[in-house]
């Protein structure tokens, strides 16, 4: 497997993200934020223009809490507890692979930790989700039996296109 070494400086608009950090940290009843222009515009446009097309590789979860088409990156298995692994996925564009690699980098995790004030060491899952007419996601928790100190979903990042 070949993982390209890339320059990540033109992907994420960290200045804008950090400018919204205090809002995230102080929102009630829990920390949350909404950041416009998360990506630099050129990089966003590349991601948008190469967003994966819906085909037979997408699936629909069968539980009653959601109905939306999903596609996982690489060899991820939606039915396992395996953490996300940095890898190339030739079914996605070079730009999506670059972003996926960057999300696994120390720089990305350190910056998201700085933004959120939550120490992050990795992430669990990465998926594409398409909500069409009739799609839904019910309010839910991913691991309702875990104690807060053990909770594996410390930060959820949703990027909309």
Kindly give the residue locations of the regions a language model identified.
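Short hydrophobic "helix-edge" motifs at membrane interfaces and signal-peptide entry regions
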Residues: 20-22, 130
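Catalytic core of non-heme Fe(II) oxygenases with the double-stranded beta-helix
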Residues: 88-161
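Methionine residue identity
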Residues: 1-5
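Non-heme Fe(II)/2-oxoglutarate
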Residues: 6, 12-15, 22-111
């Amino acid at each position: 497997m070949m993982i390209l070494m890339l320059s990540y400086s033109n992907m994420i608009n960290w200045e804008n993200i950090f400018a919204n950090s205090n809002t995230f940290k102080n929102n009630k009843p829990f920390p949350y934020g909404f950041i416009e222009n998360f990506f630099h515009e050129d990089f966003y446009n590349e991601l948008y223009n190469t967003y994966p097309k819906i085909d037979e590789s997408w699936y629909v979860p069968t539980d009653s809490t959601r109905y939306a088409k999903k596609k996982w990156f690489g060899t991820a298995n939606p039915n396992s507890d395996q953490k996300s692994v940095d890898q190339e996925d030739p079914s996605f564009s070079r730009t999506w692979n670059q972003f996926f690699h960057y999300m696994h980098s120390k720089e990305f995790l350190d910056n998201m930790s700085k933004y959120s004030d939550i120490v992050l060491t990795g992430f669990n899952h990465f998926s594409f989700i398409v909500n069409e007419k009739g799609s839904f996601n019910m309010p839910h928790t991913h691991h309702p039996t875990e104690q807060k100190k053990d909770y594996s979903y410390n930060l959820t990042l949703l990027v909309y296109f």
